[in-house]
């Protein structure tokens, strides 16, 4: 049966993959840097993204820029919140009773860390909740947070990662895995 087909671990066709990822007009030699979302998130996905982008950056001798997934989600919130600047609390379910949490101050073209990404409990987020700030992420589904919830949709676009990475380049920020 097709359900039980063997999984193969064949080497991917990198040329085909790169051709699908990059439009024909983009040439790898034209890149100034490579950015990727460095978590928190699925370990396997993060490891794959880091390895793939590190290989490109190393071979082209260009900077590799890690961007926090939580920071990218916060940046994405500007699609829904038009009143700038604002503070947004990003909180996603991690595992067991833990949550991934960070807070950011957003303006039209910059994002500052208010609270570094960390693991917290539900009790913690109930204590820090403020009716003035905005919320994004799947850990805010409790009714008491509903009035300030931007979205519980847990995602971000490559555009958010690129925008943040571009701001780092403009600021000539040094790049580290801790973003």
Q: What annotation goes with each model-predicted range?
A:
Residues 9, 65-179:
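Oxyanion-binding and handling regions
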Residues 26-27, 58, 80-81:
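Short, charge-rich binding segments
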Residues 18-33, 128-133:
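Phosphate/pyrophosphate-binding loops at sites that engage ATP/ADP/AMP, CoA/4′-phosphopantetheine
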Residues 13-16, 51, 55, 72, ...:
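Short amphipathic alpha-helical face segments that pack within enzyme cores
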């Amino acid at each position: 049966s097709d359900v039980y087909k063997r999984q193969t671990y064949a080497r991917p066709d990198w040329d085909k993959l790169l051709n699908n990822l990059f439009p024909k007009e983009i040439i790898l030699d034209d890149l100034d840097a490579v950015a990727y979302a460095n978590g928190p998130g699925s370990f396997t996905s993060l490891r794959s993204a880091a390895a793939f982008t590190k290989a490109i950056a190393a071979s082209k001798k260009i900077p590799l820029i890690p961007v926090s997934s939580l920071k990218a989600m916060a940046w994405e919130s500007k699609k829904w919140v038009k009143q700038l600047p604002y503070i947004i609390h990003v909180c996603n379910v991690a595992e067991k009773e833990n949550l991934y949490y960070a807070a950011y101050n957003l303006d039209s073209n910059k994002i500052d860390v208010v609270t570094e990404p960390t693991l917290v409990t539900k009790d913690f987020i109930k204590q820090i909740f403020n009716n003035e700030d905005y919320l994004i992420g799947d850990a805010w589904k409790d009714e008491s947070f509903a009035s300030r919830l931007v979205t519980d949709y847990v995602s971000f676009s490559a555009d958010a990662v690129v925008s943040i990475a571009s701001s780092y380049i403009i600021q000539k920020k040094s790049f580290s895995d801790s973003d």
